[in-house]
Amino acid sequence: MALLPSLLTALVVYELWPCGALGCDLPQNHILVSRKNFVLLGQMSRISSAICLKDRKDFRFPQDMADGRQFPEAQAASVLHEMLQQIFSLFHTERSSAAWNTTLLDELCTGLLRQLEDLDTCLEQEMGEEESALGTVRPTLAVKRYFRGIHLYLKEKKYSDCAWEIVRMEIMRSFSSSANLQGRLRMKDGDLGSP
């Protein structure tokens, strides 16, 4: 399956990506929580994705999100926050609870909340700087459109097991792509991503 090698590549990039030397300070454990969330998404698989091939869909992940270098730091933090918020909203629903192992789902949602809290602090730091909030509107709208498409897909497929599996794999892809955005943010108390 072509998706697995790209996920593994993204995870390796995520593990090795140097955290930038910019002004947003994230706690040192932020990257560890992010890695754990990625692993939890992998563990949540309940059915073989091979039986869901007919349900595959290109959700059109915003390609400019895959390369975090084109965003100023305030935008990177804002876009990452929006992505994590949308992922949390997707998995923190009654329909999602019915589809997944609730223990893994609860761990994932707790980890996402921790990351969101870290980014809230980061965004508060950035608000005092010159970057205007208007500069973050276009990228965050692209993220919202992307997730709206995922929600519509689930609804069209009547929240079937295969639809949830396809969405889980897509979220893993978008989550691993967010590593580039996280790479723009400096880790407090040392860079875990530095070689």
UniProtKB/Swiss-Prot annotation:
SUPFAM superfamilies: 4-helical cytokines. Disulfide bonds join 24-122, 52-162. Residues 1-23 form the signal peptide. It is found in: Secreted. One of its GO terms (cellular component) is extracellular space. PANTHER family: INTERFERON OMEGA-1, TYPE I INTERFERON. This is Interferon omega-2. It comes from Equus caballus.
